[in-house]
Design a protein with these regions (language model features):
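Rossmann-like S-adenosyl-L-methionine
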Residues: 1-175
Length: 176
């Protein structure tokens, strides 16, 4: 809750704005949410009104293009893209897309800021995602600390007999 207070926040692949709205409600100084879905952004904007928030804006844009042209840096960046690897055959292409998007997103994090990144692709293992993330930090010439690793909550249980139900990876990183 206190992580966002007084901070600038960028929420990439915001969908209906959950992370962005929560950051704004928790006292973020300014919040920008970006998603490529006009329908999702429309819902996110309605959520601003429902929550009577003033320090938040949403933009409908291709996230890859948005981060490549964005010059501002933020104290906290969330990156929660949709599933990039729907099948085993798409794994390598997905890892390249995760790498590219995470590299661009990391460049928008101010020194000392937080980078919170996710993958919801079962085909990408936690080890693969962490290795990709380490490669991103090296390429960017930055260091970081993983403060927390997460998975899906209890309302999305992991079935022992169905390994694809263990799909969500979350890394909360402090950027040096």
């Amino acid at each position: 809750r206190n992580l966002a207070a007084g901070k600038s926040v960028l929420d990439l692949c915001t969908y209906t704005g959950a992370f962005a709205l929560h950051a704004a409600k928790c006292g973020a100084r300014d919040v920008v949410g970006v998603d490529s879905s006009e329908d999702a952004i429309s819902v996110a904007r309605k959520n601003i009104e429902l929550n009577a928030l003033k320090n938040i804006q949403f933009e409908c844009a291709d996230v890859f293009e948005f981060v490549s042209r964005q010059t501002q840096t933020f104290d906290m960046v969330f990156l929660d893209p949709p599933r990039f690897a729907p099948s085993k055959g798409s794994r390598d292409k997905a890892l390249r897309a995760y790498y590219k998007l995470n590299l661009e997103a990391l460049s928008k994090v101010s020194p000392g800021g937080m980078f919170i990144t996710f993958s919801c692709s079962h085909q990408i293992s936690r080890n693969d995602f962490q290795y990709m993330l380490a490669s991103v930090f090296r390429k960017a010439g930055r260091d970081g600390q993983i403060l927390f690793q997460g998975s899906q909550p209890a309302d999305h249980p992991i079935l022992i007999s169905c390994p694809e139900t263990q799909y969500l990876k979350a890394f909360f990183c402090k950027v040096m």
